[in-house]
Amino acid sequence: MYAWHQVPAIDMLFNQFDDKSPVAQFGNVRAVKELRSVANQMGYIRTLSETYGGGGWDETFKDFKRLGDWEYVLGVNFMNQHLSHMTLTGARKYDYPPVFTYHSPWWSNYKSLNDYYARLSWVMSKGVQDNDILVIEPNSTLWSYYSHTKSSKQLMEVGQAFQTFVTTLEKSQVEYDLGSENIIKDQGAVKNGQFVIGKAAYSTVVLPPLMETLNKPTFDLLQKFVLQGGKVVRFSSPNRIDGAENSELA
């Protein structure tokens, strides 16, 4: 859905760092990289994050900066603080604090930190991130294991492997974009030996671990990309197209 948002957005809840779980909030590299990648590919200027929700009444300015700096270095450039109550009557006291109003004792001192993120947001929205590596997300493989009636061990294994993979790339300071096959279907092309998605172009495409199937449009573009001299780095060997085994991948 990010591709169709004029300002694509995520939220980042809580104040516990976790860079391992695919469903984590603070520490989830994949979530922010998906956001930034789509903005790079679609040419969007702003990337929004609803931040701080559920961190608790005891969340400090140090926590605020730690959370904000982490997501900004990964590509967020517009913050929406969660949240501002008109009143704390009743259950509102427990509705995912902190609260960014005069109800919080630090409110009168918050301007300095807010000005910092205002300036950082402005600066980070003025440049263009030009990444040369595309990591295709294993969406098709994940959907092939999904069931709304029961849990899937394979689904969790693929998700965890991908989470670990992109986090390892980030810790190794590898700059890359993530590629959604759904967006590739609509925005993908191959031009002059480059794998193109919208306004972004890549000379290297990476297939992550445990990828088993590709969409037909993705496969066709990869074939054309290789014929034009593009580089494909495989950490897995998919053997299915649109979920069906295909001899072209043998």
Predicted regions and their residues:
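Carbohydrate-binding surfaces of carbohydrate-active enzymes
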Residues: 1-8, 12-250
